[in-house]
């Protein structure tokens, strides 16, 4: 088992003891430390934290622990569930929340997961802020809320669509030109949240022919999820067979993209 503590959050393999793996005890400790940091430092008046996740097998378990720890610290939580990393970052700003936690180990294999910590602007904590969270966790200097001050969980599944709509409004995006081009597009979403979002985005952009690989978001990644050349052979073959104009491959939380022509 592995647990890596850094200024950007914690990541590790699922299981093990609290110091050697990403498990419920380790998650509660670091979420409570993050919540304490937010209480001390936020300039936002709302008491909300946004939580989004990729489609890893461990995601539902990790999310439930995170929701419990945050509400136990007295925070309300906006649970946006399956969402890309950029979508979760935007949701923090749109909600005017005081922070956010993204549950993803990015391009790492399925046995990994992580907590990525955001400030009230939807940005990752800087080095000094991350170090403060680690210090609070090491000292366990956090106090949970009493029964009358527990937080609540609010489910909001609209942010993927809201993000797509915001893309369509960008000046650089010409939907009519894309539609008129009749592009044939191949995608590989590595069985994670890209499979929820990328086909919808392409359809909204006017792409009529989409050739899909691994779009079911069940978390059993069909191949190494890092979109680097040695992991692109399958979509390259699909593009040749389908005579696609372009191919897009994303990692599990859709913050890495490979474009194949």
Question: Model-flagged regions — what are they?
Answer:
Residues 5, 185, 246-250:
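Residue-level marker for buried hydrophobic side chains located in beta-strands
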Residues 3-7, 47, 109, 117, ...:
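Short, flexible coil/turn micro-motifs enriched in small/turn-prone residues
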Residues 1-68, 72-73, 152-183:
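An N-terminal, well-structured beta->alpha segment
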Residues 117, 259-261:
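Conserved hydrophobic "DFG−1" position in protein kinase catalytic cores
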Residues 36, 48-112, 200-259:
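N-terminal small/polar loop signature for handling phosphorylated ligands or for N-terminal nucleophile
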Residues 13, 113-242:
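Gly/Ser/Thr-enriched, mixed-charge loops and adjacent short helices
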